[in-house]
């Protein structure tokens, strides 16, 4: 957790549920702009290991730790997983300690630490972001995190992000938590989803001739629902799965008088989805390239959740 300038015995307070939140409520009202918003409580090393394993951190990753404390997450990512990265913290003593720890670990060529507000930190280059922040800070950060490149991995110790449900979460024993008193730790993991809400259109060859398709999608974080229109017939999406930029779904609709199952899998690239389409039915068995284009975006998709806009009648396939 990021440090606060006020020195308080947080370890005792944090042993009980709500202790961290209670301390934050004391600190925030009197804090000047730019002062730290969360207290410093180190993440136990065994939790650090599980966080990095859950995010599958590797040599190609660039990790940013928000509220980096003594630097242990960034240093472990570099030393054990070959990653690069940096940590941010407001307390100059923590920055000094982090640099000393990085030097001792022999990873100063791959890590750095910066004294600055985490809300002023450029996160755009990160492939992995780690954090041990309080719930209200996570919620305040959430819109910025959703702006990151699809596929960016986020790992939080103990606190979630409200109604943005984690892709993975679990509870583990942490014997070194609370200054050695021990306790349980929660780990939450998300993959930043691509934005797919809107109306998508494409054509696919069916029975030797191109057939128009239209897809209307609604999105709440990584959860996607919607309907497909195929040659004037409609079907509800099934098995929709969005993980980062990887998007897949299926539906069954009548084509040429017989039901045909459609299975799509592709990668979202802005206003395009590029992948493959597989069709299977009594009269049709085919697989082809799939290239969908977004015809209509929602009025605003910055906040998520978002609903698909309706097409004008001139844009709808008949």
Mark where each language-model region is:
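Active-site capping/gating segments
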Residues: 160-201
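Central antiparallel beta-sheet cores of small beta-barrel/beta-sandwich binding domains
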Residues: 194-269, 274-288, 293, 302-318
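Conserved class I S-adenosyl-L-methionine
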Residues: 59-69
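Conserved SAM-binding motif I beta-strand of class I
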Residues: 84-89
